[in-house]
Amino acid sequence: MAGERPPLRGPGPGETPVEGPGGAGGGPGRGRPSSYRALRSAVSSLARVDDFDCAEKIGAGFFSEVYKVRHRQSGQVMVLKMNKLPSNRSNTLREVQLMNRLRHPNILRFMGVCVHQGQLHALTEYMNGGTLEQLLSSPEPLSWPVRLHLALDIAQGLRYLHAKGVFHRDLTSKNCLVRREDGGFTAVVGDFGLAEKIPVYREGARKEPLAVVGSPYWMAPEVLRGELYDEKADVFAFGIVLCELIARVPADPDYLPRTEDFGLDVPAFRTLVGNDCPLPFLLLAIHCCSMEPSARAPFTEITQHLEQILEQLPEPTPLAKMPLAKAPLTYNQGSVPRGGPSATLPRSDPRLSRSRSDLFLPPSPESPPSWGDNLTRVNPFSLREDLRGGKIKLLDTPCKPATPLPLVPPSPLTSTQLPLVASPESLVQPETPVRRCRSLPSSPELPRRMETALPGPGPSPVGPSTEERMDCEGSSPEPEPPGPAPQLPLAVATDNFISTCSSASQPWSARPGPSLNNNPPAVVVNSPQGWAREPWNRAQHSLPRAAALERTEPSPPPSAPREQEEGLPCPGCCLSPFSFGFLSMCPRPTPAVARYRNLNCEAGSLLCHRGHHAKPPTPSLQLPGARS
């Protein structure tokens, strides 16, 4: 059909990706830069906001509002994470790029991208159980096997993430989501906006600390002190989550006892734990909260210990046959055992199948628990003005260029012996062939054919068993071997998503309903007080970098040499506010002249135009437009 755009697809078997006329490659025969492939894949997975209805606000965060939506064509229920701040655009793109490359049952599944009024919004799977924080604060009974399974799910997700060479940096009970299915619970890890490549500190080389980011209650002591830190910071955050699971208390120091050096107050914490708690489970939580990072075990060993604890746990007894204690342990009763982490607790009664924290509701925020007459409650986060009591979120620079995170395995870790039960043999993971590539590792992947753009039964998403380990070193001299590009799992009629055009600009309104705001209202972008003189304090330069990101410079003369990795403008009218220069590693400004085929939203060039309809259908319920 004349005037119709050919379908977007990746290179087929035996094909070598080359640039078309006027492309960034400078002519036919040159390989396409990875930024172009990432951009084209992002355009192919775009959705319009008015493709969804039944919008219900289910939560809000520091940068976004979360809506439960239903796709009109497929009827699939998803979660739309609408970005509220234009300055957070690059962090959102980093999160989308990373989630699009992760495939694991305990990692939140990425469904697609939605663009509305110049803002990028992520579409993820819907978790009907809410957050782990909401589950623990509810009166829902949770037996010890259920809690151990939740902890194992989170540990397996983080083990997979660390194996890809990336660590989370913002692991909290707010960012762990729960799915209810078949009378049980499954936990997944989400919110990868602060994820970073695992650093490698070599002897003799200059060691520059990473930025101080995260939620203070879950941040490791070395992070709060501005020291060097790595993936072991996630282990400390996991230990705080385990303490929340064991005692069913919030991470607030008014409920979860902490020391003045941001550690866990072990004697005071044990007063919150009933005698029925499995001792290895408690010791694992204490071990993960070690002050010394080298003393914390990696997640490969943590998952092994959790699996062994589950195997050794006695069979649960029906609730009707459970003997109730005469005087159940409450938050203000019990003595404080001394002797450090190695002090033993009374042996648990094998007849008990549920935690004693299920016998009464969690404490209300108005009545913090008491830890004994001889203990003083300490909130170390209130002693520093920059932390503001811990009810904030520390950020690096929300507007810095989005550097894709390479998904490569980190260097071998030194095994750390856990002072717990005897460990089984190490989990043997099958080795997968290493494929070397020159593209940005976290760039979205292209669908091979046009079938993902049309409604109908689509292929199932690629599972973890079919993926490859990526060895994406920028200095690799080997070209990428030709082969079929893996398909991007988009939601069609099953778990995929359809390809549509860009978003319209009409405003949206949400269905009235209860709003669950689980995050504090304050956001801090700078580093802790007193670090302004340090040369590595990158967080204090956020405002100049934000202005630099929005600035557009004229394009270079045609005769100037061009590099292969250069920033490309978005070809779609929906992405005109974007520069998309941060998709590339090239620091040169974005050219002002569009060099690709125009992807405007005229009816003649749409991938899926509406036929003879005079007007596009209007949504019954609308989402509020993002502020640009």
UniProtKB/Swiss-Prot annotation:
The active site is at D170. Residues 478-487 have a biased composition (Pro residues). Its cofactor is Mg(2+); Mn(2+). Induction: Induced by fibronectin-mediated cell adhesion of Schwann cells. Induced by sciatic nerve crush injury, expression peaks 2 weeks post-injury and returns to normal at 4 weeks post-injury in the macrophages of promyelinating Schwann tubules. GO terms for biological process: actin cytoskeleton organization; establishment of vesicle localization; negative regulation of cilium assembly; nuclear-transcribed mRNA catabolic process, no-go decay; podocyte cell migration; positive regulation of protein localization to nucleus; positive regulation of stress fiber assembly; positive regulation of substrate adhesion-dependent cell spreading. It is found in: Cytoplasm; Cytoplasm, Perinuclear region; Cytoplasm, Cytoskeleton, Microtubule organizing center, Centrosome; Cell projection, Lamellipodium. Residues 1-35, 330-376, 424-490, 538-568 are annotated as: Disordered. The keyword Transcription regulation does not apply. It comes from the Eukaryota. Residues 529-628 are annotated as: Required for interaction with SPRED1 and SPRY2. Required for TESK1-mediated dephosphorylation of SPRY2 and SPRY2 inhibition of ERK phosphorylation. Activated by autophosphorylation on Ser-215. Kinase activity is inhibited by SPRED1. Weakly expressed in sciatic nerves (at protein level). Highly expressed in testicular germ cells. Expressed at low levels in brain, lung, heart, liver and kidney. It is an enzyme of class 2 (transferase). It catalyses: L-seryl-[protein] + ATP = O-phospho-L-seryl-[protein] + ADP + H(+); L-threonyl-[protein] + ATP = O-phospho-L-threonyl-[protein] + ADP + H(+); L-tyrosyl-[protein] + ATP = O-phospho-L-tyrosyl-[protein] + ADP + H(+). PROSITE patterns: PROTEIN_KINASE_ATP, PROTEIN_KINASE_DOM, PROTEIN_KINASE_TYR. ATP binds at I58, G59, A60, G61, F62, F63, S64, E65, V66, K81. Residues 20-30 have a biased composition (Gly residues). InterPro entries: Actin_reg-Ser/Thr_kinase (IPR050940), Kinase-like_dom_sf (IPR011009), Prot_kinase_dom (IPR000719), Protein_kinase_ATP_BS (IPR017441), Ser-Thr/Tyr_kinase_cat_dom (IPR001245), Tyr_kinase_AS (IPR008266). Its EC number is 2.7.12.1. Keywords: ATP-binding, Cell projection, Cytoplasm, Cytoskeleton, Kinase, Magnesium, Manganese, Metal-binding, Methylation, Nucleotide-binding, Phosphoprotein, Serine/threonine-protein kinase, Transferase, Tyrosine-protein kinase. The extracatalytic C-terminal part is highly rich in proline residues. PANTHER family: DUAL SPECIFICITY TESTIS-SPECIFIC PROTEIN KINASE 1 (PTHR46485:SF3), LIM DOMAIN KINASE 1 (PTHR46485). Belongs to the protein kinase superfamily. TKL Ser/Thr protein kinase family. Dual specificity protein kinase activity catalyzing autophosphorylation and phosphorylation of exogenous substrates on both serine/threonine and tyrosine residues. Regulates the cellular cytoskeleton by enhancing actin stress fiber formation via phosphorylation of cofilin and by preventing microtubule breakdown via inhibition of TAOK1/MARKK kinase activity. Inhibits podocyte motility via regulation of actin cytoskeletal dynamics and phosphorylation of CFL1. Positively regulates integrin-mediated cell spreading, via phosphorylation of cofilin. This is Dual specificity testis-specific protein kinase 1. The lineage of its organism: Eukaryota, Metazoa, Chordata, Craniata, Vertebrata. The gene is Tesk1.
